[in-house]
Amino acid sequence: METLSYSQIKKRKADFDEDISKRARQLPVGEQLPLSRLLQYSDKQQLFTILLQCVEKHPDLARDIRGILPAPSMDTCVETLRKLLINLNDSFPYGGDKRGDYAFNRIREKYMAVLHALNDMVPCYLPPYSTCFEKNITFLDAATNVVHELPEFHNPNHNVYKSQAYYELTGAWLVVLRQLEDRPVVPLLPLEELEEHNKTSQNRMEEALNYLKQLQKNEPLVHERSHTFQQTNPQNNFHRHTNSMNIGNDNGMGWHSMHQYI
């Protein structure tokens, strides 16, 4: 076995170092953060804005995103409406006439935010998209209570928005109630609740109330039909529902017309 002297080892090391120095050094290049990191450090509002901009530029993305994102629960929708209503009430100026033009101009943006939210959410609880009568009624009841709490003003022009909301709620009510015409099992009709809604709205929901009264008048026929159905399907039970309802125009699509007002 060959034994290397110190001088030989030193020479070999020098030759090796010389080879390294002749190699092309790969230097780093500046670049932005990876997309995953950018998303991690972006706040929710930024991501929301970016997503909407991408959908506007690439409409096909909307279908894919709808297929991925889960629909919000009813509780979430109602909570959103309540928060918007709180923001509206908190935006009133301190002191002064809260029914005057100045007050309306101060709260107008928050007022419209409530209407826009209703405009987006109500159709999600109407057939044919939503066919569950009880769920539809529950949401419409909550939405009606929100409209009841919208402020009114001395200037009748400022009250057009609320009147239109009642009109649309009435139509949605009619659409949901008409689901019962073909149902073999009919839930308990919430007549008292709708009467209270109509009273609070100053008879602006009378059309839906009259329709519900007509349903109640035909209730013996309905129950006879239901009894026959139960005899052939004994496992089915009557659905009991004590909540209320409301919203829309004759064909249930009236919320689309809200855009001309807001």
UniProtKB/Swiss-Prot annotation:
A biological process term (GO) from this entry: proteasome localization
Keywords for this protein: Nucleus, Ubl conjugation
Subcellular location: Nucleus envelope
GO CC annotation, single: chromatin
Molecular function, one GO term: sterol binding
Pfam families: Cut8
Quaternary structure note: Binds the proteasome.
Protein family according to the UniProt entry: Belongs to the cut8/STS1 family.
Name recorded for this polypeptide: Tethering factor for nuclear proteasome cut8
Organism listed in the record: Schizosaccharomyces pombe (strain 972 / ATCC 24843) (Fission yeast)
Source organism phylogeny: Eukaryota, Fungi, Dikarya, Ascomycota, Taphrinomycotina
